[in-house]
Amino acid sequence: MKTLEKVSDFVGKYMAAIVIVVAAGALFFPGPFSVVKTSWVNTLLGIVMFGMGLTLKPNDFKVVFSRPKDVIVGCVAQFTLMPFLAWMLTMVFHLPTELAIGVILVGTCPGGTSSNVMTYLSKGDVALSVGMTAVSTVLAPVLTPLLTLLYAGQRVDVNPVNMFLSIVKVVLVPIALGFVVNHFFHEFTQQAVRVLPLVSTTAIVLIICAVVSANSAKIMTSGLLILVVVVLHNLLGYLTGYAVGKALKLDTTKCRAISIEVGMQNSGLATSLAAAHFAQYPLATIPGAVFSVWHNISGAVLANFYARTADKQ
């Protein structure tokens, strides 16, 4: 068990580097990585979400009732800024339909699971970050399909009901199961969560393997455009999230949490939805996969920057 914990700690610490290496391998040498199929994406995402559920406790939801304003501000920013920024970038860069769908899906998804760790590293308000992630994830089955319909409905047929059912199945059900297991078998989960970074990172890496290796040729021809759009989307999310907090005169720790929570998305869910509901557009899965790689890099850099500025204050 101790060996697994050490491996898990290593993987958690160097997740960004591991993701980059694997993504590059799947891009330039897709053959060996193509053993991981895109049909596995939903199952792999479910594993990540189950792991998230194992870490949730009733106390994590207290911030919703003790500081509703902060959570509301953060979640409203999450579901207004990122979808709009995604749509705006698809228009500015005249993205083809299949790429535009993928970018919009990233924008309409809830906060990413690694945002809580980045907020902790940034010396931000961790309780607010956890609360925002939990609430935005619970709201996702309703808001993600509706926002996707709003921003992508002019380009493609969007079935909000089917998307709702998909999100419930691959996100809410695994989280709820993890939460229940943690509640009734707390001593077991205390041991299990020690190797959670290893399990979650492995699942995320496999999702990236599946998507990148299956679309390597197309990524090679349009990869730079996708990367530019994804980077801008992510960075603008950080910037506007922080700006909203400052405009509403929230303290710096809250601004950091909102900034990171808004900028980091559950891009695995975006990839899952693209594969399940827009299979006729294979490239729609790519923005989510690229975002998964990029936001772990940018999140770590931003967290380090925020932490340094906090030390100087």
Region spans (language model):
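Alpha-helical transmembrane segments of multi-pass small-molecule/ion transporters
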Residues: 1-313
